[in-house]
């Protein structure tokens, strides 16, 4: 089985108050299950993008092939996460 890249999800912007208590600067190592302490709604929104980055994929609309941004689905208190692929050790 090919190795998978690590992906870090970092909160880079916030409007309103997150019901899960997330704040700008929070970081999570994304795996195949919801990281401890991460809102499950946010995880469900970013999981498909994180999976693509983990397997070496990229997004044609991004300038950096190792990252993308994803918003959580809360329309009244949105957070934006930056997903960044890390190197394989």
Locate predicted features.
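Short, charged beta-turn/beta-strand-edge "cap" motif at the junction between a beta-strand
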Residues: 15-16, 33-38
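Short acidic, Pro/Gly- and aromatic-enriched capping/linker segments at domain boundaries
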Residues: 9-19
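Short, compositionally biased
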Residues: 40-57
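Short, compact, well-ordered microdomains
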Residues: 3, 60-89
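Short, basic/aromatic beta-hairpin or loop at an interaction surface
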Residues: 1-9
